[in-house]
Amino acid sequence: MDAYSLSPTDSTTYSSDTFSTEFHTDAIAPPGNTPGNYTLDYNECFFNFCECCPPEKGPMGPMGERGLPGPPGERGPLGLPGEKGETGLRGPPGPAGLPGANGLNGDIGEKGDQGPVGLPGVPGIPGKPGEKGDPGLKGDKGERGFSGLKGDPGERGEPGLNGTKGSIGREGPMGPGLAGTKGLKGEQGLKGECLQGEKGERGPPGLRGEMGLNGTDGVKGERGEPGPLGGKGDTGARGPPGPPGGRGMAGLRGEKGLKGVRGPRGPKGPPGESVEQIRSAFSVGLFPSRSFPPPSLPVKFDKVFYNGEGHWDPTLNKFNVTYPGVYLFSYHITVRNRPVRAALVVNGVRKLRTRDSLYGQDIDQASNLALLHLTDGDQVWLETLRDWNGXYSSSEDDSTFSGFLLYPDTKKPTAMENL
């Protein structure tokens, strides 16, 4: 009881839901405004009937005696599930109880200690084979395996057909001709002689004259005319050798010489570099549940016979070309109840087509094979056309699709490498 409760001497009684839980002021609402039965003594007319005059809160009274236990309350609603508590310590084993009903599957507990080996149980009834699971995701590419041992040499093949005549080769460069010999110095020409005029006859001696005075120098005479050309002289001595002459024109190609004697065997060369063997192949089949595949879509080959390199994609039902080169593809289709038209498709282009017109319960086989040159990134698959989708498979008959790399492309030598 609180400060607002009635005194112990009051004879007023109320039901459990007398007072309302909503208040307009701090005062307690009058009992007449609440539902339920109650009794009011006339001496208690001082009780607050009006919200305008709320009573003041008095001091807290002494704690009363403990009342009798009330009747059990109604069961409340189911509470929210609590959080999972931590695993407690393992208690001592209790006595074996009676087998209870099977409870709900609980969370997986921690792995316990290994118990003692039990007695062999009664063999159970063999279960039914489970349904086939969905194909798993494509695994990561495995690491490179070790190089295999060198195989035995194969048998010698039959001689090939005569090849076509090759085109005429280009004109070769000028050959290293011999340099011409140094020419001899030409002979020196003869010295020409000038003819001398004939000497005149001597005149008679004159009288001796007296010594005359020294005369002045006379005027210098004019140069005389050149004499006539002399005759050819004798051959002179041999002169020194002249300068080397220019390079002569290349001579004609000589005849092929005789084959020389075989030389001695050369030393053993260093070991060559190891070449990684490139492989790419697949072989898949059709499960009976995939018979009569939908047309114009890649046929879903689920039965994998070989896919060692992982180049066949089972999710897309396509072969992914990883190495450029020449590939061989073949397919063998069992036909039943309806005709079939199949096509080998490369990047959306139908390269090879096959048809087999069959009706009724007869069974037939349609097959084909082709060599294709493909590049890195190409995709190859098999599909049926329109409503001619009689591809069939059973426990006795298979429809297969296979392919492998026949030989990869090789690097072509450049002009500099040829030199």
From Swiss-Prot:
Q: Enumerate the residue ranges of region (Disordered).
A: 63-275
* Domain C1q per the UniProt entry, residue ranges: 275-412
The principal location of this protein is secreted
Q: Does the keyword Secreted apply?
A: yes
Comp. bias intervals (Basic and acidic residues):
129-144, 184-202
Q: Does the keyword Ribonucleoprotein apply?
A: no
Where is region (Nonhelical region (NC2)) located? Answer: 20-57
Q: Which GO terms describe its cellular component?
A: collagen trimer; extracellular region
In this record, what's one Pfam family?
A: C1q
Q: Tell me where on the tree of life, at the top rank, the source sits.
A: Eukaryota
Residues with attached carbohydrate: N37, N320
Residues of the region (Triple-helical region (COL1)) are 58-274
Functional description taken from the UniProt entry: Forms a microstructural matrix within the otolithic membrane.
> What are the UniProt keywords, alphabetically?
Collagen, Extracellular matrix, Glycoprotein, Repeat, Secreted, Signal
> What is the reported tissue distribution?
Specialized secretory supporting cells at the outer perimeter of the saccular epithelium.
Q: Where in the cell is it found?
A: Secreted, Extracellular space, Extracellular matrix
Question: What's the name of the protein?
Answer: Inner ear-specific collagen
Q: Give positions of region: Nonhelical region (NC1).
A: 275-419
Signal sequence: where?
A: 1-19
Residue stretches of biased makeup (Gly residues): 227-236
Show the stretches that span the lipid bilayer: none
Q: Which Gene3D superfamilies match?
A: 2.60.120.40
